[in-house]
Amino acid sequence: MDKKSARIRRATRARRKLQELGATRLVVHRTPRHIYAQVIAPNGSEVLVAASTVEKAIAEQLKYTGNKDAAAAVGKAVAERALEKGIKDVSFDRSGFQYHGRVQALADAAREAGLQF
């Protein structure tokens, strides 16, 4: 089993449990150059809010889009957008990525901005 398939296996297991709970999910996807965050409805078929370093408004504020500062900016942006739509409680779906570095920075920034998970 290679690194990617192991991560996907971990992510699938976590998503199955979150689906049983019927929770709104804050999903994170990470690449070496960018980080993406989406708030997905409990049914799993609707993206309620999204933010990423690909967006011009966020990328202009940053020197580089693949570091912890960029992840924190995305976390803050997605939390503010979720609160505008009335979403306060979410479950954090790290997509099989280790809770460390950029993933942790995004989660901490989202918590500081008012999301609860």
Curated annotation (Swiss-Prot):
InterPro entries: Ribosomal_uL18_bac-type, Ribosomal_uL18_bac/euk. Residues 1-17 are annotated as: Required for binding of the 5S rRNA/L5/L18 complex to the 23S rRNA. One of its GO terms (biological process) is cytoplasmic translation. HAMAP family: Ribosomal_uL18_B. One of its GO terms (cellular component) is cytosol. This is Large ribosomal subunit protein uL18. Belongs to the universal ribosomal protein uL18 family. Keywords: Phosphoprotein, Ribonucleoprotein, Ribosomal protein, RNA-binding, rRNA-binding. The basic N-terminus is not necessary for binding to 5S rRNA. It is however required for cooperative binding of L5 and L18 to 5S rRNA as well as for binding of the 5S rRNA/L5/L18 complex to the 23S rRNA. Part of the 50S ribosomal subunit; part of the 5S rRNA/L5/L18/L25 subcomplex. Contacts the 5S and 23S rRNAs. This is one of the proteins that mediates the attachment of the 5S rRNA subcomplex onto the large ribosomal subunit where it forms part of the central protuberance. Binds stably to 5S rRNA; increases binding abilities of L5 in a cooperative fashion; both proteins together confer 23S rRNA binding. The 5S rRNA and some of its associated proteins might help stabilize positioning of ribosome-bound tRNAs. The protein has been shown to contain a phosphoserine, which was required for the protein to bind to 5S rRNA. However, the presence of this phosphoserine is controversial, and it has not been seen by mass spectrometry. The keyword Aminoacyl-tRNA synthetase does not apply. GO terms for molecular function: 5S rRNA binding; structural constituent of ribosome. It comes from Escherichia coli (strain K12). The lineage of its organism: Bacteria, Pseudomonadati, Pseudomonadota, Gammaproteobacteria, Enterobacterales.
